[in-house]
Regions:
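Catalytic alpha-helical scaffold of carbohydrate-active enzymes acting on polysaccharides/glycoconjugates
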Residues: 2-197, 221-244, 250-316
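Positively charged, amphipathic and often flexible ligand-engagement surfaces
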Residues: 185, 197-219, 239
């Protein structure tokens, strides 16, 4: 039995070293469009069914396929209007199934980070070698298709395992979105490299707000504005991060898009205080400027709960 994952130290939000983002900004804002492929009849997994309904589930499949056929383009057009880039949580199968989407993202200089191969192929039950193969596929596939070396990770369908952090650190990933413990980046206790947890969000993730909680579009927009306003206020003390995880099959429905646009307009109206960035840009800046100060503060306050010996990450 294990009481906690021992992936990071308890580090109270108060009295940390003050983070200042580039240009003196108070809040780092990033968008995470999840561009995924769901299989009509996926392979079975002992830890989780592929679909909540009996498989094959044409309803669930076709709704998500709508997201890639229609919703993505509608969402991309909206983000273009606000001159916002996405950091794409990518199922690498998108490269084969929907290459036009990948090309459009590259054209706009969007970031890609790993979200597995298919979002219906879970990591539960995999050994380290099998999970390593998924990670290597992500690195290789995105590099070949886009020229980008991916630096971030979100386990497919959030099926993080006990091996995930050490594996992605071994391959010189900079950040993971699998942890939800903070509103600022935090160093993680991996044996290699400088891996951080990147604030993602379940609270404002459209899968939760629309799929689980059944919020109205107006309510969701209000939640986004409140989330932003609070984090911006706290950014006066020390820089915060706000991420909006998105799924086009949800947020880009015709009756929902205008209210999401209203929320983005509210956020963009505070441009003087906001760093609009990709997740990789946030991670790179934090690792270079704030990593050492964070570790020193954790150590000085007697909060470290286990030694972290960092070694060079594996090149790929």
């Amino acid at each position: 039995m294990q009481s906690d994952p021992n992936s990071y130290d308890y580090w109270p939000y108060v009295d940390r070293p003050k983070i200042v983002w580039p240009g003196g900004k108070k809040l780092a804002f990033w968008l995470a469009p999840n561009i995924e492929v769901y299989e009509y009849d996926p392979p079975s997994n002992p830890g989780r069914p592929g679909w909540p309904r009996p498989s094959p589930d044409v309803v669930g499949y076709s709704q998500r396929d709508w997201g890639n056929r229609i919703g993505h383009w509608r969402l991309m057009e909206l983000l273009d209007r606000f001159a916002l880039r996405g950091s794409v949580s990518l199922s690498t199968a998108v490269i084969d199934h929907y290459p036009e989407i990948v090309e459009a993202c590259v054209e706009r200089q969007w970031e890609f980070f790993s979200h597995g191969i298919y979002n219906t192929r879970y990591l539960y039950g995999m050994d380290a070698a099998q999970e390593r193969a998924v990670i290597e596929d992500s690195i290789r596939s995105v590099q070949n298709a886009t020229g980008q070396r991916i630096r971030g990770y979100l386990a497919p369908a959030l099926t993080h395992t006990e091996n995930t952090l050490e594996l992605i650190a071994e391959y010189d990933f900079w950040y993971t979105c699998d942890l939800f413990q903070d509103d600022q980046p935090q160093p993680l206790k991996a044996r290699r490299g400088k891996l951080i947890s990147m604030p993602y969000s379940l609270e404002v993730n459209d899968v939760i707000t629309y799929g689980a909680l059944g919020m109205t579009p107006a309510r969701y927009a209000d939640v986004l504005k409140r989330q932003f306003d609070q984090l911006l206020r706290e950014g006066e003390t020390s820089g915060t991060v706000m991420c909006i995880p998105l799924h086009a099959y949800l947020v880009a429905q015709p009756h929902r898009l205008r209210m999401f646009s209203d929320a983005l307009a509210h956020i963009c109206a505070h441009a003087q205080d906001v760093w609009f960035a990709t997740a990789a840009e946030i991670a790179a800046f934090y690792r270079e400027v704030w990593w050492d100060a964070a570790l020193a503060d954790i150590e000085a306050r007697g909060l470290a709960t286990g030694g972290t010996s960092f070694a060079p990450a594996k090149s790929f």
